[in-house]
Regions:
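Small/polar-rich, solvent-exposed N-terminal microdomains that initiate assembly or binding
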Residues: 1-41, 59, 67
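A general marker of short, structured functional hotspots
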Residues: 17, 24-29, 52-53, 76, ...
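Sterically constrained small-residue positions within well-ordered secondary structures
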Residues: 22, 45, 89-91
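Glycine-rich loops and low-complexity Gly/Arg-rich segments
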Residues: 42-43, 54-58, 78-82
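Short intrinsically disordered coil segments
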Residues: 44-49, 69-73
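Oligomerization/assembly interface segments of phage tail-like spikes and tubes
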Residues: 46-62, 94-103
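Acidic-leaning, charged glycine-interspersed low-complexity segments
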Residues: 68-106
Length: 106
C-alpha cells in the first residue's frame, strides 16, 4: 500500500514520507494507514481494506487549494475512494488531511 500511496502523491507533491518528515522541504506530504482484514474466503482474509490519511503541509502563503484538488484527483486515479478533506492548519503552516480507503489484495 505504501508504494501505491507514494506513486499517487509524488507527481503532485515531490516529497512524501511515511508518518514523519524531518527534511528541509517547505511543501511535503506524510501518510499513514491502518489495515482491516476484508474479502474473506477459506477462513482467512484475502485482501486488506486500508484506511489512508495523506497529510499535506505547505507555507501559509502557498496556493494550497489547487494542490489539494490535484492530490484528491491523484488518489482517485490510483483507485482510492474519493478523499474527504479536513483543514488542520494553524498560524504556522497550512495542513490538509485527505482521508480515503483502498484495497490491498496482496
Amino acid at each position: 500500500m505504501a508504494r501505491v500511496i507514494v506513486a499517487a502523491v509524488t507527481p503532485v507533491v515531490a516529497v512524501c514520507a511515511h508518518n514523519l518528515y524531518q527534511g528541509e522541504a517547505l511543501e511535503y506530504c506524510t501518510y499513514n494507514y491502518s489495515e482491516i482484514p476484508a474479502g474473506f474466503g477459506d477462513d482467512r482474509a484475502i485482501a486488506m481494506r486500508c484506511l489512508v490519511q495523506v497529510h499535506y503541509f505547505c507555507p501559509l502563503e502557498h496556493p494550497a487549494r489547487a494542490v489539494v484538488r490535484d492530490l484528491r484527483r491523484a488518489l482517485e486515479a490510483a483507485d482510492f475512494t474519493s478523499p474527504s478533506v479536513e483543514d488542520a492548519g494553524d498560524d504556522t503552516c497550512q495542513h490538509y488531511v485527505l482521508e480515503c480507503e483502498g484495497i490491498d489484495g496482496g
